[in-house]
């Protein structure tokens, strides 16, 4: 075995990779029982109509001193009211300027509901949609709303945005929506194209600034510019597929875009390009032989990983595995997607090193294996230096991190 063939990664144990069908069914049954046990004391949490006690526990979860929660607050602006039309409040400005913790890892001893959910996501996949919570909803729909801190729904707002009809970006939206997860029959049956168009048009109207006053059109309001850009159709798809209603999907999608990855949807896709740059840095650090093999074939992340970074891996089937990966990204931050892509490269490592034309393999990635990717990613994160990890954390949302790309 040559030095280039020797992987620097340890092989983590996975929960469901390589199992027979019957074994996978047993794992799914165990998963459902574990999540049902976790949710039993939290039945009142299921949805925006949660009790005051539940809201208080979620608020405590949002302000915990764990490094994971601190980072998620910084990424999402959690708990602060979103400002419409692309602006940000004074509170969110302070949030963006706050210093990051030096490291991030799954909570070791979760004590509040949201922390317990995050911990469980790392160890146990969420049950399939056929398994419902005690309140009759899917586990994933409840978990995503809790992780995104969705406390209420404004149905009237969504209806008013939909009533505006075609947005200024309608033609661009229509050019993309018919291609969204086109090979996934389950998605096409559950999410009709008109729903996706309606949600994206409403998002554009929500941030349309044509009628802004001069006072609102100041430098502070121009930090983020929200409209429709390439890839947003794919980012919206998992929300429409997962959430119980279109209004819930719109609320979660809006929160996700505005707080988790606003720089990924700027006109220049600055956050995406920064993520690709960081992917190259991480791969060179974690697996120099593979990095130099790809660079020797003139392959940088900009060439082979653009779709995976832009869509947070949602462009790679199958959809159920994408949703499992997104459980992890929503729990610990979308910045982890960069390391998830490095993990995929590790899984393909032997084939890539043996190939004289690795781009042929990278152009058609193997099906996602979410549990394996998550386990490898958690292992990789331990070897990332604090300064590089801080760059990873900030790149989806902090304007300073993409100054060179604007």
Model-derived regions, located:
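Hydrophobic/aromatic-rich, well-ordered segments within soluble, folded domains that form packed cores
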Residues: 141-147, 228, 308-332
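Short sequence/structural elements of tandem HEAT/ARM alpha-solenoid repeats
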Residues: 191-195, 251-252, 270, 320-324, ...
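N-terminal transition regions in large eukaryotic proteins
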Residues: 1-225, 236, 240-243, 397-406
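Active-site-adjacent structural elements in folded domains
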Residues: 184, 188-189, 193-223, 276, ...
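Contiguous, well-ordered alpha-helical segments that form the cores/surfaces of helical PPI scaffolds
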Residues: 198-202, 233-241, 251-255, 281, ...
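Extended, Lys/Glu/Leu-rich amphipathic alpha-helical scaffolds
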Residues: 94-95, 113-116, 248, 256-304, ...
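Secondary-structure capping and boundary motifs in well-ordered enzyme cores
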Residues: 135, 224-228, 245, 249, ...
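Eukaryotic basic, amphipathic alpha-helical target segments in cytosolic regions
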Residues: 43-46, 151-155, 181, 185, ...
């Amino acid at each position: 075995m040559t030095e280039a063939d020797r992987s620097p990664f340890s092989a983590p144990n996975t929960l469901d990779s390589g199992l027979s069908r019957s074994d996978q069914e047993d794992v799914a049954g165990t998963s459902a029982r574990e999540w049902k046990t976790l949710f039993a004391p939290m039945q009142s949490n299921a949805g925006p109509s949660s009790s005051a006690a539940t809201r208080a526990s979620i608020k405590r979860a949002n302000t915990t001193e764990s490094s994971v929660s601190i980072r998620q607050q910084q990424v999402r602006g959690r708990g602060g009211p979103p400002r419409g039309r692309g602006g940000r409040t004074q509170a969110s400005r302070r949030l963006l300027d706050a210093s990051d913790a030096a490291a991030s890892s799954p909570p070791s001893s979760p004590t509040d509901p949201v922390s317990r959910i995050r911990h469980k996501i790392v160890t146990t996949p969420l049950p399939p949609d056929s398994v419902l919570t005690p309140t009759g909803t899917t586990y994933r729909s409840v978990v995503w709303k809790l992780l995104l801190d969705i406390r209420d729904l404004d149905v009237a707002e969504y209806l008013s945005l939909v009533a505006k009809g075609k947005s200024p970006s309608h033609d661009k939206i229509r050019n993309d929506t018919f291609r969204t997860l086109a090979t996934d029959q389950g998605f096409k049956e559950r999410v009709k194209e008109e729903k996706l168009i309606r949600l994206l048009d409403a998002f554009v109207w929500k941030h349309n600034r044509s009628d802004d006053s001069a006072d609102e059109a100041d430098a502070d309001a121009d930090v983020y510019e929200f409209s429709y850009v390439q890839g947003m159709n794919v980012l919206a798809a998992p929300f429409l597929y997962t959430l119980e209603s279109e209004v819930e999907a719109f609320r979660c999608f809006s929160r996700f875009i505005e707080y988790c990855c606003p720089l990924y949807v700027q006109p220049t896709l600055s956050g995406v390009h920064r993520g690709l740059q960081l992917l190259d840095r991480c791969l060179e650090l974690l697996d120099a032989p593979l990095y130099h093999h790809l660079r020797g074939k003139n392959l940088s992340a900009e060439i082979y990983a653009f779709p995976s970074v832009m869509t947070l891996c949602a462009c790679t089937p199958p959809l159920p595995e994408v949703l499992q990966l997104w459980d992890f990204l929503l729990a610990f931050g979308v910045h982890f997607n960069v390391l998830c892509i490095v993990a995929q490269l590790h899984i393909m490592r032997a084939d890539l090193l043996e190939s004289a034309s690795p781009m042929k393999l990278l152009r058609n990635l193997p099906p996602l294996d979410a549990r394996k990717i998550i386990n490898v990613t958690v292992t990789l994160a331990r070897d990332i230096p604090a300064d590089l990890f801080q760059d990873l954390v900030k790149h989806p949302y902090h304007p300073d991190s993409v100054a060179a790309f604007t």
